[in-house]
Amino acid sequence: MKSLEELYNRAIEMKNKGMSDKEISTELHLSVNTVTWLLSKEFVNERSAKDVKIGWRSAGVFGSRIGSLAEIMIDIAEEESNKMNLNIDAFLGITINGIPFATLASYMTGKELIVYRPHPSRKEGFFSSNFASVVNKNVVIMDDVVSTGETMKRTIEDVKKSGGKPVLCIVIASKLNIDEINGVKIRAIMRTVMV
C-alpha cells in the first residue's frame, strides 16, 4: 500500500468485516492508535504521519525468503545466547506473523516450537496445546514487527506466569527506540526511526 487513502480503505474494509482495531493493526503492521486515527479519517486534516507501515510481503510470499529471514534471526539468537551463556530451549511464535519464523527456527535448530496467541482485548493470551509448553524453558520470542511493544510485553508476562523464562525477543522490524521490554532484550533486523 502506497498511500494513507489506500491504508484507510483497507482498514475500513476490515472494520466492515467485523475485525477489531487490534486485529486490523496486526494485519496492517500499525499500532492500534494509528488504526484508530486512520479510521477516524483525521489524516485528511493533518500534514505529517504519526506511524510507519512495515510491509514485508516481498519476503512473505515464498517460504525460502521467510527461511532466509529466519536464518538471520537464528544467528542473532545464537549470538545473544552465547553472550548470556545460556541454552535456548524453544522458539515462540506470536500469532499470526511470528509463527513462520519460530517454526523455521525450531526446525533448523532442533529446538521446541511454542505458539502464543494474544487476546485482542488485552487480557491474558493463551498457548496452543498442540505445541510445546513454556514450563522450565529458556524461550526466544519471535514476531514480525514490534510497534508499541504492548503485544510483546503481554507475551513476556504470560511466558513468565506460565513458568517459562523469556530470554530474548527477535523481530524483523522494531518501531521502538528501546533495547529491552520488561527486562528482556529485544533485537531487530531493522529499526525504524521518525526523523
Swiss-Prot record:
CDD domains named among the record's database cross-references: PRTases_typeI (cd06223)
InterPro entries in alphabetical order: GfcR-like (IPR022854), PRibTrfase_dom (IPR000836), PRTase-like (IPR029057)
Stretches assigned to coiled coil: none
UniProt KW Transport keyword: no
MF-aspect GO terms: DNA binding
Keyword DNA-binding: yes
One Pfam entry name: Pribosyltran
Alphabetically ordered keywords of this record: DNA-binding, Transcription, Transcription regulation
Gene Ontology process terms (BP): regulation of gene expression
Residues annotated as signal peptide: none
Domain notes: Contains an N-terminal DNA-binding winged helix-turn-helix domain and a C-terminal regulatory domain (or effector binding domain) resembling phosphoribosyltransferase (PRT) domain.
Family, per entry: Belongs to the purine/pyrimidine phosphoribosyltransferase family. GfcR subfamily.
Entry-linked NCBIfam families: PRK02277.1 (NF002620)
Protein name in UniProt: Transcriptional regulator GfcR
Organism: Picrophilus torridus (strain ATCC 700027 / DSM 9790 / JCM 10055 / NBRC 100828 / KAW 2/3)
